[in-house]
């Protein structure tokens, strides 16, 4: 490929990662005049040693086509790195970049990346068909602290109170200015605040546009579902929201798949910040902590699976069977399924769900048997059940 595009939420480490690989760079967010130069004379900002980083390229979206033509003219690999904290609205004149520009999604750090997880059990190891054994050092309260802090690289060396303040400031910036700057459409900050709070309350759930509209409507008034949809699209554009799509798979039974996505903010720390939930409050509310823990696990699974080009989905059918995470590796034609349980009391229920999915629902003649089945927990010990289902604490999960 002639270029790589690094996308992800503000503060997840895109620029630092790109600078580590770039031979030269230009940062469009440093000066309005630099943006103007990029729009008027894009070839000028492409000059420099390669790979050449163009940081926050979306501030001058018209350079996309110019960059594509430059790649065609040079006929060389690894010429440019683009990084951006929002995705400009596509227009008919902008080429997709297919065949020329590879896309890389970055996210806040998984626990193994921040050093909170030992990483002693990898996803690959789970698929080897052998029993697992490990011990997590993370207590129930430690997990609550990790969820509230979030996985932002800039928070590694600061205390939890400061990390919470960062997450609150992050949310405030989204409410007040980030959406308008990225999307170019005026919005109501209070409406965005209510929407993100609603998403935070419904984190890891399949909340509908109608239910969110009802939840965020001020007293005595209403909000149209299409308005909610527009705001959700905008939040997706700035990567503050990352929906978890439903798995589309061939079934052997008469069950019908549900197709609604689950809602997740970019990091569980943002959900806690939006609702003013600190470590003590989260730890004392097991029900909501379970939702936040699931979101933290999904964040980590997305990161870990992406190392092998895997993608994460969820499963639900019309009989009520749900599985929290399906990892699909399209290049290897493999899949795996994970349930998420904060405590140990529902591990048996999770095991039954996983076995029912693998043995009764999925047409294994078409998609194959699962590489592994696992229950990701907030407990202490990793082990393998007689059924072959693994029980794996998040505090030992790694690459």
Q: PLM features: what roles do these ranges have?
A:
Residues 156, 160-334:
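Accessory nucleic acid-recognition modules appended to NTPase machines
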Residues 91-205:
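Interdomain motor-coupling "hinge/lid" segment immediately C-terminal to the ATP-binding subdomain
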Residues 38-81:
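Conserved nucleotide-sensing/catalytic segment adjacent to the nucleotide-binding pocket
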Residues 17:
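Hydrophobic positions on the alpha1 helix immediately C-terminal to the Walker A/P-loop
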Residues 6:
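Hydrophobic anchor at the beta1->P-loop junction of P-loop NTPases
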Residues 14:
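Conserved lysine of the Walker
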Residues 376-399:
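Domain-level recognition of nuclease-like catalytic cores that cleave nucleotide substrates
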Residues 10:
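The conserved Walker
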């Amino acid at each position: 490929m002639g270029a790589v595009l690094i996308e992800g939420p503000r503060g997840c480490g895109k620029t630092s990662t790109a600078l580590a690989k770039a031979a030269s760079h230009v940062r469009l967010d440093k000066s309005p005049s630099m943006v103007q130069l990029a729009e008027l004379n894009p070839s000028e900002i492409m000059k420099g040693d390669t790979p050449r980083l163009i940081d926050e390229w979306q501030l001058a979206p018209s350079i996309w086509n110019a960059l594509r033509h430059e790649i065609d003219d040079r006929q060389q690999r690894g010429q440019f790195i683009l990084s951006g904290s929002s995705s400009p609205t596509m227009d008919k004149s902008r080429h997709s970049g297919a065949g020329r520009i590879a896309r890389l999604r970055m996210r806040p750090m998984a626990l193994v990346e921040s050093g909170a997880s030992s990483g002693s059990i990898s996803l690959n190891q789970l698929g080897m068909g052998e029993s697992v054994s490990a011990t997590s050092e993370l207590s129930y309260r430690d997990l609550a602290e990790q969820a509230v802090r979030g996985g932002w690289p800039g928070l590694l060396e600061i205390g939890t109170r400061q990390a919470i303040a960062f997450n609150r400031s992050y949310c405030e910036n989204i409410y007040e200015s980030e959406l308008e700057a990225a999307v170019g459409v005026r919005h109501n900050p209070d409406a965005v605040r209510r929407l993100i709070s609603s998403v935070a309350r419904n984190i890891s759930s399949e909340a509908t546009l109608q239910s969110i509209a009802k939840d965020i409507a001020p007293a005595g008034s209403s909000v149209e579902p299409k308005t909610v949809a527009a705001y959700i699209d905008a939040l997706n554009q700035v990567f503050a929201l990352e929906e978890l799509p439903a798995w589309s798979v061939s079934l052997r039974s008469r069950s019908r798949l549900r197709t609604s996505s689950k809602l997740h903010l970019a990091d569980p720390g943002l959900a806690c910040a939006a609702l003013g939930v600190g470590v003590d409050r989260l730890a004392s509310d097991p029900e909501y902590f379970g939702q936040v823990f699931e979101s933290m696990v999904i964040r980590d699974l997305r990161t870990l699976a992406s190392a092998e080009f895997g993608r994460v989905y969820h499963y639900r059918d019309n009989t009520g069977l749900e599985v929290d995470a399906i990892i699909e590796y399209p290049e290897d034609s493999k899949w795996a399924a994970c349930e998420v349980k904060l405590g140990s009391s529902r591990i048996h229920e999770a095991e039954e769900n996983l076995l029912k999915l693998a043995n009764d629902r999925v047409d294994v003649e078409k998609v194959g048997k699962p590489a592994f089945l696992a229950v990701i927990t907030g407990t202490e010990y990793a082990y393998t059940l007689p059924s072959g289902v693994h029980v794996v604490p998040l505090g030992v999960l790694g690459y």
